[in-house]
Amino acid sequence: MMTISDIIEIIVVCALIFFPLGYLARHSLRRIRDTLRLFFAKPRYVKPAGTLRRTEKARATKK
């Protein structure tokens, strides 16, 4: 059976491990997040080919 002191000890040990690791990893988290976004997310701001290369008939007339 775990006592309250065992639970507090586990919390302190986890804090001693994960706070320094998070502090050290914070400079590389943006690069990791951007890499994952490029692999798994849909490109939102890429225009389809139709809006980049229109035919002469579809273009607006110049005034």
From Swiss-Prot:
Transmembrane as UniProt keyword: yes
InterPro entries on file: Cellulose_BcsF/YhjT
Record field: transmembrane: 4-24
Pfam families: CBP_BcsF (PF11120)
Gene Ontology cellular-component terms listed: plasma membrane
Membrane-related topology note: Single-pass membrane protein
Biological process annotations from GO: cellulose biosynthetic process
Top-level taxon: Bacteria
Cellular compartment(s): Cell inner membrane
Keywords: Cell inner membrane, Cell membrane, Cellulose biosynthesis, Membrane, Transmembrane, Transmembrane helix
Disruption phenotype: When the bcsEFG operon is disrupted in a cellulose-synthesizing strain (a strain K12 / W3110 derivative called AR3110 with a restored, functional bcsQ gene), cellulose is no longer made.
Additional free-text comment from the UniProt record: Cellulose production is abolished in E.coli K12 / MG1655 and W3110 due to a premature stop codon in bcsQ.
Record-stated family: Belongs to the BcsF family.
Name of the protein in its database record: Cellulose biosynthesis protein BcsF
UniProt gene name: bcsF
